[in-house]
Amino acid sequence: MKVRYFHPINNVFEETVWDKPDIKNTEIEVKTKYVGVSNNDLNVIYNQTPYASNKYGCESVGIVTKVGSKITDVKVGDFVATTTNHLYSDFYNCKTEEYVKIPKCSPRYILEPIARSLNLITQNWNKFVELNRNEGKILILGSGFVASVLYTVLTKEHDVDPNRIYVVGSHNKSIFNKSLYNTLPIHLYDIVFDLQGLNTPLTNNILNTNSLLIIGAAGKPTLIDLNLLAHKSVTINFPSPDNNKFYESLNDACRIVETKIFDPNKFWTKGYKRDTEWKSAFSIGINRPKHYNYGYIIWN
């Protein structure tokens, strides 16, 4: 089956065609309806990070068009949110645990970025529960989309007192309220989510004994004085969608959107038509004008 897709050539996405194979018995075929344009994909054009082939276009919503013989959780015509790296294809194949059934076909259910946010906790669940019982301080470095999901889930799902949470950044004041700080409050923190990639927790004495450091953004190489970490028994974790807990996070993402615990609408600024406006989704996403968050591409 010949299928259109986007391919990065000389750090610009170009439209081309490939031969999509038929599904295996543990796969479904999906017709694309919405795809979020992620920061990772924009880095193809920025040329800020090396990009592996076939590793983009993974924030998707679509309609099931074929079902493998061993698939029992969805049927043809169902709507799904997927995490498959499908190259912005018109149709693509999706493996078990790379999709979840969703109640309606809407960009609200572009779940992959929400699942990535939840996975910061899910992948570290046992350690998180242990430290959260102590009711110590929690630091979130960054105030964008991921931080918003984290803060909402911490306060609404895990009943964390907002007074225990310190968010460093300058965005989404209406979400963080008094928890938002422009500069780093110097305390000893039990749990730190580093979403900025500045290596701040490794170059400042802010980690408590037996603390948990979750690194959610890659930083530049930095010389670190290990005396800051010595004898503190710090657990450092690098969450990833490749972790076996990610499917759990994907299901949780569907639940918190469906129950309106978290509302993603304000973060999707604009949709662009696949056939006539797709280049604008990338060019505007790169330039990121004021009050612009994220764009997505709409298939007919």
Residue ranges and their predicted role:
Residues 19-36, 46-86:
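Glycine-rich beta-strand-centered segment in the early N-terminal region that forms part
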Residues 36, 68, 196-197, 217-218:
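Short glycine-/small-residue-rich Rossmann-like dinucleotide-binding loops
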Residues 77, 89, 188-190:
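Local beta-strand N-terminus motif with an aromatic residue
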Residues 115, 144-149:
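Residue-level detector of alpha-helix initiation sites
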Residues 134-143, 151-202:
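Adenosine-nucleotide cofactor-binding segment
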Residues 199-259, 298-300:
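Glycine-rich phosphate-binding loop and adjacent beta-alpha segment
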Residues 247-300:
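C-terminal hydrophobic helical "lid"/dimerization subdomain
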